[in-house]
Curated annotation (Swiss-Prot):
It comes from the Bacteria. One of its GO terms (molecular function) is ATP binding. HAMAP family: Phosphoglyc_kinase. It catalyses: (2R)-3-phosphoglycerate + ATP = (2R)-3-phospho-glyceroyl phosphate + ADP. Its EC number is 2.7.2.3. ATP binds at residues 201, 292, 323, 349-352. The gene is pgk. It is an enzyme of class 2 (transferase). Keywords: ATP-binding, Cytoplasm, Glycolysis, Kinase, Nucleotide-binding, Transferase. Substrate binds at residues 21-23, 36, 59-62, 118, 151. GO terms for biological process: gluconeogenesis; glycolytic process. The keyword Cytoplasm applies. This is Phosphoglycerate kinase.
Amino acid sequence: MSIRTIKDCDFSGKRALVRCDFNVPLREGNITDDTRIKAALPTIEYLKSQGARVVLMSHLGRPKGEKNLRYSLMPIARRLSELLGQNVKMLSDCIGDEVVTAVSCMQNGDVVLLENVRFYKEEEENSDAFAMQLSKSGDIFVNDAFGTAHRAHASTSGVASYLPAVGGFLMEREDEFLGKILKNPESPFVSIIGGSKVSSKIAVLESLLPKSNVMVIGGGMAYTFLKVEGYSIGKSLLENEYIDVASSFLKKAKELSVEVILPIDHVVASEFQEYSMPEYVDSVNIPDSKIGMDIGEKTLKKIEGVLSSAKTVIWNGPLGVFEFDSFAKGTAKVAEYVANCPGITVVGGGDSVAAVNKFNLSGKITHVSTGGGASLEYLEGKVLPGIKVLEV
C-alpha cells in the first residue's frame, strides 16, 4: 500500500505542521551530530518553495512529560537557521493561544519551531485532546519523522485525526526502500543480520527468511545458532532459552532452501574487554576458555562472495563487537563489501548505520535508514502507526 506524500497537496499559503525527528545528540547544549536535522531539509525547502508556512515539531530526549530546558529545541532552531540561511523562530511552547497567535502571524516561506512535544506527558499517551491542540497550528499534517513512526504518539499519528496527513520526502524514501525489501526484492537477495541477541532479532530473521536467497547471521547471536549445530562456542554469548527457537529457524531455512551463513572462523578473546588481546581461531569451534568477539577471514571471504553477485542486500546489526577497535574488522569489511555491491543496498538499524558512518561509506549505500527501532519493526512486518495514517 502506498502513502500520500507532500507532492499530493497544494501548500500555497497553508500552514504545514511538520513532525520531524530532531532527537539529536547534545553535549553541554551543543549538537554533536546534525545528521537528522540535515535529513529533514529537503522536505522543509520544498514546502518553503511551495509557499507554505512551515511549522516544525519534534521531541528531544526523555523529559518525562515535564518542561525541562535541558531538553529544549533551542539548539536545533539555531542550527536550522544556519542551514536554511534564514531565521527559524523558536516558540516557547508547542500548544496554546500564544503558539496559535505566533503561527497566524507567519508569512509564506517562514519557518518556526515548536518547543519539545514531550514536555507534555499527553504526547506519549497519544492524548486525543493534546493532538487536537497541536493540530491548531496547521492546515496539513506532514509526517517526516520515520525514526518515531513505530510510536503511536499524539504528534506522530494522533494529529492525523484532525488534519489531512501526508508523508515528507524522508518518510517516502524510507517506505519506498524498506517496502521494496519486504514486498518485491530482486534476486539474489542477501540478508545480513547481526547484533548480540537472538531474542531481539528473531522477528526480523523470520520476516526476511522467506524472501532471502542467502542469510548471513553474525554478531553475538550467531553463537546460539552454532551451539544448535553442535559446535563448541567456549564462553561466548549463549541464550539457552532460544535454543529451540534457533533450531526450528534453521530447519525452516533448509525447507525453504535458503543458504544460512554462520561464522566458520573467529576472532576471540579471553575476556569481554575493550583492550583484550585478539586471537584468531581457524575453526568453527571456539576453545572453552575463549569468547567469540568477531568473525574471521574465511567467513569474510564467504560473505564477500555472495555479495559480489547480489541484486538486493539488507544489512541490520554489526557482525562483531565493532565498538571495540580490536574487534571491528569484521563489521568494517562487511560495510565495505555492502558499499561495493552492484545491487540495491539498504542499511537499517542504529548500530549498522553507526558502523557505515564510522567507516565513511554511507555515500556508497543506496539507502541508509534513519530509523533504529522503526526500521527493525518495519522489517519485522509490523504496522507502524506513523505510516498507517498516511496510507492511501
